[in-house]
Amino acid sequence: MELTILSRSFVTRLIVLQILALGTSKSFSQEPAPLWKKHDINRFSPYEAVGVADFDNDGKLDVFCGDSWYKAPDWEQHKVRDVPRGTNPHYHEDFADAPLDVNGDGNIDILTCAYFSKAISWIEHPGDPKQPWITHPIDQPGSMETGYLVDLFQSGKPVFLPNVGGQVLFYELVDQTPALQWKPRMLDPAGAGHGLGHGDVNSDGRIDIITPQGWYEQPASRDGAWTFHPEFQLGAASIEIIGHDFDGDADTDIVWGMGHDFGLYWLKQSKVDGKTVWTKELIDSSFSQVHALHLADFDQDGQMEFVTGKRIYAHESEAGATAEPCVYIFDYDRTSSKWNRSSVYVGQPAPAAPLDPEKRDALKDFRPGSAGTGLQMAVRDMDHDGDIDIVAPGKSGLYWFENLLIKR
């Protein structure tokens, strides 16, 4: 399997470098024209989660991250809550910022979760978004890497899917009046681990849940039992693990990164004598801390790509922690059977970072304006110009990457 590095766009397909996917040596040519424009929303923000919605009902997409929301288009900051540090001070208790009108009042609230307090909460929009927002507890299932909303039942009503240590579960908002009611659905914990995703794995039209240990088959009946299939081992995987038919052979493949190591991989699904066979192949091994992946059609060619990159200081002590930060888009060329990579952003490493990981601080160690993927990104058309942009949080700041496809 080969990986092609694109220098201008996936539209022009200008090849500047080819490497064997099983190799580890990489070199990159300078890109002559930018495909993306980086905007600083708050280069001093230390939070790693983000949500995008119209919080002030003016028709523009705003950004929620950590303790504040930022009003489009000039990103005026409005602090609306306090977010404590975790017992490990390198992290804040904001591991998800998922926008949803929880109480049905027409204003967008935020669903959040935390690792150290083990809590899921919703942050209520007060009506005037510039006033303090109100935190309401939902549950305390365990330490969570992050969580996200997914329309699991394709009903238009998303569920909250958290990555909980030792458990696999999701939460449905089953009632808004007269009182909010969240219904947790516990699945067999055999598949629990670092990493979580979804996709129609068996092509039956229903969305399944993917974990590092296998996948859970959604039953035909909403109240039926979810069947766990322990068909693979992914390791300490990303959130999300993406289930999608990348190669166009009518079955769902799986793509994931190593959240705390080097490596971006895919499992190609095929059938042999009627049985499912998963073939593991390396996509890229040139960067580490591949913690967040998101699917979108960034180049408007009708096929889905995914964005990922380096979560800066996912753990300060990990291999590659001080290497150059990066955000990349990968797409699969079905004609050549190659993965293509295009740069959204590549920064500078932090060679002067303290040798003691406990003394490291992303805002001090990396150059101002350095961007990574954080725990989650938002992929939305931020400027309403017809193409998908990227909002990326992290310990080194909060940034919007404007897609220049339409403007070129």
Predicted regions and their residues:
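Generic cytosolic/nucleocytoplasmic N-terminal low-complexity/intrinsically disordered segments
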Residues: 1, 23-25, 29, 274
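N-terminal secretory signal peptides that target proteins for export/translocation
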Residues: 1-11
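Generic alpha-helix initiation/capping and coil-helix boundary signal
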Residues: 5, 14-17, 92
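Compositionally biased regions
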Residues: 8-10, 26-28, 156
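Beta-propeller-forming repeat regions
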Residues: 29-408
